[in-house]
From Swiss-Prot:
InterPro entries: Periviscerokinin. Belongs to the periviscerokinin family. It is found in: Secreted. Mediates visceral muscle contractile activity (myotropic activity). This is CAPA-Periviscerokinin-1. One of its GO terms (cellular component) is extracellular region. Keywords: Amidation, Neuropeptide, Secreted. GO terms for biological process: neuropeptide signaling pathway. The modification Glycine amide is found at residue 12. Signal peptide: none annotated. It holds the Pfam family Periviscerokin.
Length: 12
């Protein structure tokens, strides 16, 4: 979802 954001770049 928020790919690129720290600390958890989650790919949903």
């Amino acid at each position: 979802e928020a790919a690129g954001l720290i600390p958890f770049p989650r790919v949903g």
